[in-house]
Amino acid sequence: MCESAVYLIRGEVKSLVMQDAAKVVITDEGAVVVNSLGERKVMKDADLLEANLIRHEILLRPK
């Protein structure tokens, strides 16, 4: 599978949002993270910082 870990970066702190995310959608309100089972986490006021597909890691940051 091609899932990635999604983290929220705040300053020097890197917090895991979802381990095996299959989809990340960035909206005006924030980010929606979905895994392959359909479980969703809504990260209000989050924006994409980096998507590293080699490391299977997606970094979000507060807007």
Spans of model-derived segments:
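Compact, glycine-rich, soluble single-domain proteins
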Residues: 2-63
